[in-house]
Structure formats: structure tokens, C-alpha cells
Amino acid sequence: KYQLHLITNGFEKTQHSKLKYSGLAGYFKEVVTSEGSNSLKPNREIFDYAFQKAKATPEESIMIGDTIDVDILGAINAGIDQVHVNHLTKEPLTINDKSPTFTVYSLKELEEIF
């Protein structure tokens, strides 16, 4: 079993409303926003804040994201493994000559990793 946490470059009220109305709020133990952390992805600070709130370490964490220059680069900056959910192409993407730890093309493929 995994704990899910959310890191978003959004405002507290907006992100919590989205989670509530989508029915996803109960799945996430911690929700870290750029507003609450005073930092934006891909900066390491928002990830460090999330680690502190979740009482987690980079070594036991993984970032699942669909934006290579925000989610994946942020995870690389924070020293955690990443899963790039690539909805745009069927070719793996890189950022700053670095490849994500994993690339999937649909959320269903996450089952193969976890």
C-alpha cells in the first residue's frame, strides 16, 4: 500500500475544491500547493516542504507527473525517481539531457511499475 500526496502549482482553495468535486480528495494524505509552500515546481523547495509535511524522504518517494519541465524536472531537482505520464507523444522525452526514471503513456501502465 502506498500513501499518495499531491504537489501542485496552484492556489489552496482552488486545488482543494477541484479535489473535492472530482471525488479524489480522500485519496491524498497531504496536498502541497505553491501557495502554501511559497515555492513553485520545478524548484526543490516545494518538494522539501512536501517531504517535511509527509514525513517522507526522497529515497522512499516517487513523482508521477505529466509535465516534463515542471513535474519531472522538479523531481530530478529534488533527487527523487520520476514517472513521466507522456500524453503528447509516443517518444520518450528528456529534460536537460536527463531521462525520467520511467515513462508511461497511460495511467493504466502504472500497474506495471508498482
Give short role names for the model-derived ranges.
Residues Q3-F114:
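Asp-based, Mg2+/Mn2+-dependent phosphohydrolase catalytic module
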